[in-house]
Amino acid sequence: MINKKFYIDYLSQQTKEDGRPYETALSDFCDYLLDLFSVKAFDGTLDGFKNWQQQRLQAKPKFGVLAMAWLNDVSQAMDRGQWLDVFGMLYEDMYLTAGKASKTGQFFTPQSVSDLMSSIIGSGKNEATSAKIEGTTVNDCAAGSGRLLLAHFIEASKLNHSAGRTFQYVAQDSDPLVCKMCALNMMVHGMNGRVICQDTLAMSTPSVEYFINEVRYPFSTPYYSVRIKSGNPAK
């Protein structure tokens, strides 16, 4: 279990230094990470990539500390064959407990339920290693922070380390903040796909799309990229 207080304290301290309200803390951190791992970071050289990240880690030191803690926490979870949704935990603690859940109808799927649903759906041992699933799309049209997709990816990857990456994951949600969270979760776990911010009942024009892990850097790094495509403002 992660230390939520550690994250919340650092988030609130950085936003206070930036002159931003506490309510924006999680969104500001997500924006920071999306910039840190933007496709714009790669100019064709390892030095350019390192300089991009170093500049941003130094510009907001408290967010930099949190970024390193986040990467480490997710890495340790994946080493145990698990997925980790730090953003979802913080969102529930910082926002939904303050009454937003009852107003918006947002209730995040518990990890145990996500894992159970993934095991029921299951890709199956034979299917997970079969060429016929190459490029198969897995979609969640009310994805939130992406827990069901994370669970599916880890379940598939248990059978074959690279099996999860044969899937294309598509997440949709109408909440701009949780779309950011979902994009970062998919990126750091090594998934391929995109996150679409739109009303899936009305199939509205996406306000923004996140393309996950399109770039494969020609040097050793476990973390990939996010490309952001802006659309029409959400109505």
Annotate each PLM feature.
Residues A101-S102, Q168, C182:
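A generic, residue-level signal for flexible/boundary positions that often mark functional hotspots
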Residues K132, V215, N232:
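Basic, Gly/Ser/Thr-rich N-terminal segments that form RNA-phosphate-binding interfaces in CRISPR RAMP
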Residues S162, D175, K180-S225:
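S-adenosyl-L-methionine
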